[in-house]
Amino acid sequence: MNSKIIEYLRKAGYNPYNDFYPIIETWLNLWKGKTDFHKYKVVYDDKTYEREMYSLGMPKRIAEDWASICWSEKDTIKTSPKNQKYLDNKLQEIKFNKQLVLAIEKSAYSGTCGAVLRVKNIKKFGDELVTDKFSKYDLILMKADQIIPLRVEHGKIIDCAFVSETRIQSKKVYYIEIHELVRRKAEDGEEYETYKIKNVYIDGEGKEVEKKGILKEYYTNSDIALFSILTPPIDNPYPEANGLGFSVYGNAIDQIYACDTAYHNFVMDYYLGGKKVFYNKKLTRRDDKGNIIYPDDVSKQQFQIVGDEMENVNADGLVHEYNPDLRIEDNKSGLQFFLDLLSFKCGLGTKYYQFDGSSGVVTATQYMGDRQDLTINAKKYRENVDEFVENICAGILLLGRLLFKENVNEKDKIEVINTDGFLVSEEDLKERYIEEIAQGLRSKTSYMVRFMGMTEEEAKQELARINEEDSLSSLGLTNEDEGN
C-alpha cells in the first residue's frame, strides 16, 4: 500500500494499519506466476547467466478452482415477489455471474475481495441525488491490496476505504472512496445511523486533487453498506491484518515452491536429456578464428586431411555416446506427491490434482463423492459467498428504492440457492427444507416449487386441494360419502 495514502488517511483522523500489505504482495506475486525464488544463476564457459525456473502456476489455478467450486451459473438468488424482477434485471445489467466468479478468485488469492456498488451519471441538487435515463449500476471489484479497513468490530469491517489508481490530465492519481457508518439527526431530532460516502483524489505526494463532476460527499440515509467483503473461511494468524482475510495458499508457499522445483527438474531432464556424443580432442579442429569444429558439423564432416596419422575414428576412447536417463516415473511420482501436499494445504483435499495415464486430471465433480474434506471446506467458503451475495443484493435494492424510486425493499429476505446440488446433495437439501417448514421458517409452497417442479401458482392450488381433503377427513367424510 502506498505510504502517502496511509499518511493522508491518518491526517484525516483515521487509524489504518499498514504492516500487512507486504504479505499480501507476496500472495499477489505468486498468483502472477513468478517470484524471486524462480530466479537462479548458471555458470557456463566461465560466464554467469541468469535463468528463470519453469513453473506450474498453481496459485492461479488453485484460486480459479475455488471460484468454480463455490459458484455455478445454475445457482439462483430468490427474494420477495415485489423485489425479484427488479433484482434479476439489475444483476443481469452488471453481469453478476461473471463478476462473482472473479470476486471469489480475488478473495482466494489475495485473501479479501471487496465489491463496491456505484451508480454512474447521477447528479446532486441540494441534499438530494437525482438519476436520469443515463444512470446505471456499476459493481467494482477490489483485491486485498486496494482495501483499507478503518473500523472493525468482531472481525467485521464496518468502515472502509477503497483505493484505485486513475489519471487526471495524464497524471497518475489515487482515488480513495471512504464508506463510514455515522450517526445523523433526523428532522424530528432523533438520531439514526447512515453511511457517509466520501470521494477523494490525491496525487503522488498525498495532496488532494480536484476532479470535476464528482460528488465529494453524500449520505445514503441507510445503515446498509454499499460494499460487501468476501474472505476465505480461514482465521487470519496476523493480528495486523485488521479484518482482512488470509489467502487460500497463504500457508502453502513452501509446497508451491516444492511443486515448481519438481516440475522444473522434470522439464530440465528433458531439456538436458538429449543424446550426448563425446569426442577425443584428436577428432576436432579449429577454424581460423580459433572456434572448435566437431566432426558431426554438417558443413565440416569431411575435414580429415589425407595422410593423417589417425586412421580409425571408431577406436575406443575417440568417440563415446551417452544417453541420459530421463527418470520419467521418478519425476512423475515426486511431482504428484508435492501436488498432493499442496492441495491438502489449500483445503482441496489430498488428491484433488491427480493425474493418471487414462483420464488426465480427475475433476472436482468426480472427486467430491469420495473425499469429504473438500466438501466440508467448500461448504464453509460457500457460506461466506452467500453472505457476500446477499449484501450486494441488499445494496442494489437500497439504491433502487432511494435513487430510482422503485417499489422495492432492501430489508426483505434474500436467499442464495445452490441449484445444482454440488455442495449440498438433493436429499440433504430436502431434509433442510422439511426442518425449516416444521419450524415455521419456510412455506410448503417453496418446497413444492423447488423439488416438485411446480410453479408457485400450481403449488398453491395443490396445497388448497390437500387442505380441502384434510378438512373432509377430519369430518369423517370420504369420496364415497360425497357420492351418496
Pin down the residues of each PLM region.
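Extended, regular secondary-structure scaffolds
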Residues: G114-F246
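Extended, charged amphipathic alpha-helical segments
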Residues: E210-G369, I417
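Activation/maturation switch segments at domain boundaries
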Residues: R432-N484
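Surface-exposed loop-to-helix/strand elements on domain peripheries
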Residues: I77-K82, D287, E309-D428, L463-I466, ...
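Short coil/turn segments at secondary-structure boundaries
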Residues: L102-K106, L117-K120, Y270-Y279, Y352-S358, ...
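Extended, helix-rich architectural segments
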Residues: M1-I158, R167
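Generic structural marker for isolated residues within well-ordered, non-membrane alpha-helices
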Residues: L87, L339, C393, K444-T445
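Residue-level preference for well-ordered alpha-helical positions
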Residues: L91, Y270, S343, L397, ...
